[in-house]
C-alpha cells in the first residue's frame, strides 16, 4: 500500500474508490498498485 498526496490509476485494471472518506486505488491484477491518499 503506497500512501501518496495524489493517487492515479497505474494500469487498466486499477479502480479508484472511496472508503471512509479516503480515496484509494485497488488493483486485482497487480497488488503493488494499491494506493491510498493522505
UniProtKB/Swiss-Prot annotation:
Pfam families assigned to the protein according to its UniProt record, in alphabetical order: Ribosomal_L36 (PF00444)
GO cellular component, one term: ribonucleoprotein complex
Ribonucleoprotein keyword on record: yes
Record keywords: Ribonucleoprotein, Ribosomal protein
Keyword Ribosomal protein in annotation: yes
SUPFAM superfamilies noted in UniProt: Ribosomal protein L36
Gene Ontology process terms (BP): translation
GO molecular function, one term: structural constituent of ribosome
Family designation: Belongs to the bacterial ribosomal protein bL36 family.
NCBIfam families: rpmJ_bact
PANTHER family per UniProt: 50S RIBOSOMAL PROTEIN L36, CHLOROPLASTIC (PTHR42888), LARGE RIBOSOMAL SUBUNIT PROTEIN BL36C (PTHR42888:SF1)
Official protein name in the record: Large ribosomal subunit protein bL36
Lineage, opening ranks: Bacteria, Bacillati, Bacillota, Bacilli, Lactobacillales
Gene name tied to this protein: rpmJ
Amino acid at each position: 500500500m503506497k500512501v501518496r498526496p495524489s493517487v492515479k490509476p497505474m494500469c487498466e485494471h486499477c479502480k479508484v474508490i472511496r472508503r471512509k472518506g479516503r480515496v484509494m486505488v485497488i488493483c486485482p491484477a497487480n497488488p503493488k498498485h494499491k494506493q491510498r491518499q493522505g
